[in-house]
């Protein structure tokens, strides 16, 4: 259900291969720390269509919004400039490392890192799915989620899309 909901939030149709790949990633969430540049790029490559796989943080300006009519977009958010991403992401990763050794509650840790990540939108595609994956990753790695269990993060967000998009 979590995999299906994660794709459904973004109105992305999925197939068995994409679903299986995402399930395999979710199974790694409790075993590996994905909050470093190389792992985030690898994660992005695994969850997006291969045509949209990145080899680094994005190099063009990104916007979050919606199509309101043909060739008409409503911009909700202008992401940080590409030239700022390396330092912003390095700061986020350093903060993750500090929180991991500083006794910060896993829910606060996961929330701060996931929000920081989606705020920066470092990739052209996959940022929302990665942000939700990071919640699972941090909660599992720091012992908040019981082994073998997964909280329905995406399913909960899907229940109230207006709040999720706010």
Describe each PLM feature range.
Residues 1-166:
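FIC/Doc superfamily catalytic core
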């Amino acid at each position: 259900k979590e995999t299906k909901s994660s794709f459904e939030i973004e109105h992305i149709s999925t197939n068995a291969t994409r679903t299986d790949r995402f399930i395999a990633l979710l199974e790694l969430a409790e075993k590996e720390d994905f909050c470093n540049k190389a792992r985030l790029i690898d994660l992005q490559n695994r969850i997006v269509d291969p045509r949209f796989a990145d080899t680094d943080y994005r190099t063009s300006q990104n916007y979050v919004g919606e199509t309101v009519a043909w060739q008409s977009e409503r911009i909700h958010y202008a992401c940080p400039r590409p030239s700022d991403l390396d330092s912003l992401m390095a700061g986020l990763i350093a903060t993750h490392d500090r929180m991991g050794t500083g006794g910060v509650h896993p829910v606060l840790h996961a929330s701060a890192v996931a929000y920081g990540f989606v705020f920066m939108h470092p990739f052209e595609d996959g940022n929302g799915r990665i942000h939700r994956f990071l919640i699972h990753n941090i909660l599992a790695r720091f012992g908040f989620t019981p082994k073998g269990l997964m909280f329905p993060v995406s399913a909960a967000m899907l229940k109230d899309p207006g709040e999720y998009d706010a």
